[in-house]
């Protein structure tokens, strides 16, 4: 990884949380929230991180900002290792890294005015008399300077999220982590906020890490996409490549669930079972208990590396997809009638 070309670099990043086994249990177990994640974020781009709830995407976002301390691995910002920096040493760097939170209702202090909320970063970093700058920020995000003395309860959800965006912009950061910033909003308001974020990125040369569980939202804003499952990145590549030529079965399943105006021959891939516990993850490939391309003695024994399958497109799968979309017949052929038949899928795995 080049430290001169990337704004953010993660190398073998791992985060585990110790939790009690039960009410009466004395021992503790580890929740493997993020496991051996390596990726880069380039200046001026939007990297989307997508996956089901509990896959580790929000934990990864907080690790990037050092809101959480990593268990192991390296976090670099502009080439500088910030993995083990103290909070005091990190403080000047906070100007360069900001966050937009998921819930616009709980992320704003109801006892403070909009002016106090947006102006808080200035106060923390010792900048006084920032009223004019705060009013300019409100205009920048589509609000009126007259809103300066109002309280959060006087605004709609979309307006509250704009206040959160203004707060994130206050110190002119280079990186903004957007943790599902539109998931709590109506669809029509989602589009407005996404358009705002795109325009701000162009105007201020911002870099985004955009977290979402919704692939249709990610597609509208991301330049590259990383797909996470059970704490690991299973696929990463350019947005167009991920959507048009997914290589990992999990990515294909997520894409098949995105509503489309016309099916166009694309079939729905329904995964069996639930997401395994991050306390006791499956051996080798963590996706193998739910995978329609499971090969006994291989997928459950050997962990697939995240390997490049085409320029800029990598997937962690022993048997990556070669065809997309798939028809109902092809999916049935790959899945087999019963789990017991899966060891015999070797012949069909290479046909898909």
Named regions from a protein language model:
Residues 73-81:
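Conserved ABC transporter NBD signature motif
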Residues 4-6, 19-25, 30, 238-345, ...:
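Short catalytic/signature loops enriched in Gly
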Residues 81, 129-146, 255:
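Conserved ABC ATPase "signature" region
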């Amino acid at each position: 990884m080049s430290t001169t070309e990337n704004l953010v670099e993660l190398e073998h990043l791992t985060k585990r949380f110790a939790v009690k086994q039960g009410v009466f249990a004395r021992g503790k177990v580890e929740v493997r929230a993020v496991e051996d994640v390596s990726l880069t974020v380039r200046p001026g781009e939007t990297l989307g991180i997508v996956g089901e709830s509990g896959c580790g995407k929000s934990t990864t976002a907080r690790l990037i900002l050092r809101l959480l301390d990593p268990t192991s691995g390296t976090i670099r910002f502009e080439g500088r290792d910030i993995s083990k920096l103290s909070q005091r040493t990190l403080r000047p760097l906070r100007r360069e890294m900001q966050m937009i939170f998921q819930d616009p209702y709980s992320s704003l202090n109801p006892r403070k005015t909009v002016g106090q909320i947006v102006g808080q970063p200035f106060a923390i970093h010792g900048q006084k008399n920032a009223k004019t700058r705060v009013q300019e920020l409100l205009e920048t995000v589509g609000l009126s300077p007259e809103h300066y003395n109002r309280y959060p309860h006087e605004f709609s959800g979309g307006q509250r999220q704009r206040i959160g965006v203004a707060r994130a912009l206050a110190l002119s950061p280079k990186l903004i982590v957007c943790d599902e910033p539109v998931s709590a909003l109506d669809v029509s308001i989602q589009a407005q906020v996404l358009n705002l974020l795109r325009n701000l990125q162009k105007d201020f040369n911002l870099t985004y890490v955009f977290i979402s569980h919704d692939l249709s939202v990610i597609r509208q804003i991301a330049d590259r996409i990383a797909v996470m499952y059970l704490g690991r990145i299973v696929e990463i590549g350019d947005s167009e490549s991920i959507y048009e030529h997914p290589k990992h079965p999990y990515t294909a399943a997520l894409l098949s669930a995105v509503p489309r105006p016309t099916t166009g021959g694309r079939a729905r891939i329904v995964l069996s079972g639930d997401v395994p516990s991050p306390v006791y993850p499956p051996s080798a490939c963590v996706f193998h208990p739910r995978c329609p391309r499971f090969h006994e003695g291989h997928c459950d024994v050997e962990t697939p590396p995240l390997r490049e399958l085409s320029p800029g497109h990598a997937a962690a799968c022993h048997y990556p997809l070669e065809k997309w979309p798939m028809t109902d017949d092809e999916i049935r052929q790959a899945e087999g009638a019963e789990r017991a038949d899966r060891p015999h899928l070797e012949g069909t795995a290479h046909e898909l």
